Amino acid sequence: MTIKKLAAAGICMMQAALVFSQTTFNPDEHRTVTTNRTDGRFMSTYGVAQYMLKHTKPTCAFNPTFSKKQFAAWQKRVRDAINDIMCHPTPSVKQPQPKRLSSEQKDGYRLEKWEFYPLEGCVATFAVLIPDGIKQPSPAVLCIPGSGMTMDHLTGERPIANKRNAMALNMARQGYIAVAVDNACAGDAADLEHIAGTGYDYDTSSRLLLEMGWSWLGYTSYLDKQVLEWMKQQKMIRHDRIVLSGFSLGTEPLMVLGVMDPSIYAFVYNDFLCQTQERAIVMTAPDKRGRRPFPNSIRHLIPRFWHYFNFPDIVASLAPRPVILTEGGLDRDFQLIHRAYEISGHPENVETHHYPKFASPDKRNPNTTLPEGLTRDEYFNLVNVDPPNHYFKTDLVMPWLERILKE
């Protein structure tokens, strides 16, 4: 190409850029996804994806008209679907038994650090807090942290801004054996973050797992499952009184393990409950660059998840085992959970709470549907979520645990 042609091409590109920069873009005019075609078809790939998402009907959705027999059959379908999409492997070579790395006496409890070997080429860790003088065998709680948190935050070994989030430490002080894990990509499972002094990168590893047909949740729930199996083998733990407690991100592996393993006794769900498919459909308001929000990061992606269910369906399938939900959501979704427990014959086994800001019914959004075109903040407000007060609700959980674990 001659210099003249290169110069001409450069001028054209500059002119095009100038025209684009002079275009006035008003995000509020494009909050919802629309088409101007009379046949209702979309040219935009985003529009096509949204159309497909709206027309995706989960095959394992809970039906409030289930009979008790139908409910039991539905629970099996949910379990089969979870097993299918989590893709938990069966190692071809038997792995070594977990190994205790340390044992240290603390104020009122003993802290142990263990490592285990869930896969070839893989080692992971967990911590155990054993209250002094505890009667054995005793109930135990498997504690799963939220995003950016670690096992050491849960055990109180690393400083934490809100001490109520030191879930495992607080469980041990209450007299329960507590087992704490790291989520995949965080804590001991991090890459270079501790050296570089940066926040945890969940997305890169999640992308690699997805490329191999797995997922972040499939992997982290598989690791947690190995810890759960270890707990069942310990003489100090009552195998019929194991509780799973998840904070924020940790509620996702909690749901997976709860469905997979009917022997788990009870569940602490410390996050707001939502229809994740609906969240993706309604959060469409673009930013000033014309970028629409994605409802959650890549670590939350599980291929084919929405073909089967949404979060409330999964929690409903845990009935009749005791569950407490501590941070609200729409009353619509809580009502679905309560209905599932009614069908199971044990309505007393579910306890639900809203954020204090939305504790009064007249402060909550009573609607059963949400409008499209929402920003993230607008969505949170409409589903009765108070993000600044997202923390582990010890004041609600401890009395509940005492009640359900009382002999």
What are these regions (language model features)?
Residues 22-83, 381-384, 392-394, 398-400:
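N-terminal pre-domain segments of enzymes
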Residues 84, 88-136:
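N-terminal cap/lid segment of alpha/beta-hydrolase-fold proteins
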Residues 136-137, 141-225, 232-233, 280-283:
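Cap/lid segment of the alpha/beta-hydrolase catalytic domain
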Residues 210-211, 265-315, 320, 330, ...:
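Mobile cap/lid helix-loop segments that gate and shape the active-site cleft of serine hydrolases
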Residues 236-248:
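Alpha/beta-hydrolase fold nucleophile elbow
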Residues 246-256:
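Glycine-rich nucleophile elbow surrounding the catalytic serine of serine-hydrolase chemistry
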Residues 320-327, 351-352:
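Catalytic His-Asp charge-relay segment
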Residues 343-407:
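C-terminal catalytic histidine-bearing segment of alpha/beta-hydrolase fold enzymes
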